[in-house]
């Protein structure tokens, strides 16, 4: 639980991971964050090897099916899920087999039909359930009440949409520089928002921007320090580099700054520190992959 609570998820993930003692109260988005970013580190030294390897089938499959960037590997994800379900009763016992476990075998077909898991996920609506509930004044004709209240709110909704905002943009407040790279993707010179992966697979720690003027957004370049020591974190059922996951030493940074354009950035990275000094696992923030 202590290691779990110390994980600093990036700004784009609004819910901080809570202690395992609150597991019964975790929201669906917290479970997703644990699976995508914390699980392979937290479970590594806490599960027997055979159970951990079985879990990795699920982790890799869900990761692959969560982005169209991995579309050429979706078929492998389907195979991993088949193996996960087939071996489930051997690992956990037949009494834990359920329809939810069986339904994993249909995930590949559904993703092929409707799109990546991220594009068909309902996580963004999770926080809106409370607002829907508040639109109801009685138990009579609930749906009509909700529709009427939402329609009324839409008439007064004046907030800007992302389509009205030009990307990238730079904001400086004190010693903190924030680059809004793309919708839902920020780089900031702090602990949890500074790591990103370049398209040539270099891991870089963001330091500063180089911009000719406040309005010259087309000439923004990113400056940062390259991580010199990195390697694979696993090689089964596929190599971690195939899904852009690496381990690295956070104090092995290049001495000189490197500079690149926004177009050279592949994705933001979530840095999850292990129990080894200065070692971190770098995992792509799924929705920022291009």
Residue ranges and their predicted role:
Residues 1-290:
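Terminal interaction-prone segments of large eukaryotic proteins
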